A protein has these predicted regions:
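Sec-dependent signal peptide recognition
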Residues: 1-6
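C-terminal motif of bacterial Sec signal peptides marking the signal peptidase cleavage site
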Residues: 12-14
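Ser/Thr-rich, low-complexity intrinsically disordered terminal regions
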Residues: 16-151
Length: 151
């Protein structure tokens, strides 16, 4: 009788196994990264700035070594972020994506960082990195799409 109850419970709950997500690549830093053969930092910087603009993000910084964008996030995500990062007394919350570009001979090594941050009273910055496999795979797939080589 006990086994029938367990089987019935499993049937009602949907004994479906959760999909296991595998990373697209294992990188030295643990963040999405790639090497672009024979590409200058300047051309890649422009590519990443255009990508940010297409996402509707505000470009905070653009140089040959870094492109940093402030992503537009919904009020719901902002509320969740405030609750997760601190009390209700804080500055507006921001979600950033940053492309770091490092010259290696004729090649450029790119590492992508993504995080949420806010400033609490007293000036302290609280930051939470986006480090889920969903984010990681999306960013790594983007690097693959625009012509990267594995690290």
């Amino acid at each position: 009788m006990r086994y029938i109850f367990i089987l019935a419970l499993c049937a009602l709950m949907g004994c479906e196994e959760k999909e296991v997500i595998e990373p697209l690549a294992i990188t030295p830093s643990g963040w999405p990264e790639a090497i672009f053969k024979n590409k200058s930092r300047k051309s890649l910087s422009e590519t990443f700035a255009v990508h940010c603009a297409k996402l509707g993000a505000t470009i905070v910084e653009e140089s040959e070594t870094r492109v940093k964008c402030d992503e537009n996030i919904s009020e719901g995500v902002k509320s969740w972020g405030r609750a997760f990062l601190c009390t209700g007394h804080s500055s507006d919350i921001h979600a950033y994506i940053q492309f770091n570009l490092i010259k290696r001979g004729a090649d450029t090594h790119v590492k992508v960082l993504n995080w949420m941050q806010l400033q609490i009273p007293g000036g302290q910055i609280r930051r939470k990195d986006y480090n889920t496999l969903y984010y990681y795979n999306d960013a790594q797939a983007y690097l693959y799409k625009i012509g990267r080589q594995p690290v």
